[in-house]
């Protein structure tokens, strides 16, 4: 393919995200396993490949370990916001075909 290429990489920031430094790899993995940050390749705007989710997890598991999302859980659970985030993750999973066929 001629022309520019673009790579978007998720790199957890322990200080900015309010998460433990030893959790950075786990948070990056959770971001993909929830469907919030799909890993895929595209050419000319068309998805050509995607990394399948091995173990699907709800978005809450990704949000809870991060202090930047604490307002979604305390003082009261913001279930409407979490549901919208889950809906977005579910849409990504369908759009990018992230589940193996037997889980689809």
State where each predicted segment sits.
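Short, conserved beta-strand edge motifs with alternating hydrophobic and charged residues
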Residues: 6-10
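Flexible, low-complexity linker and terminal segments
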Residues: 11-104
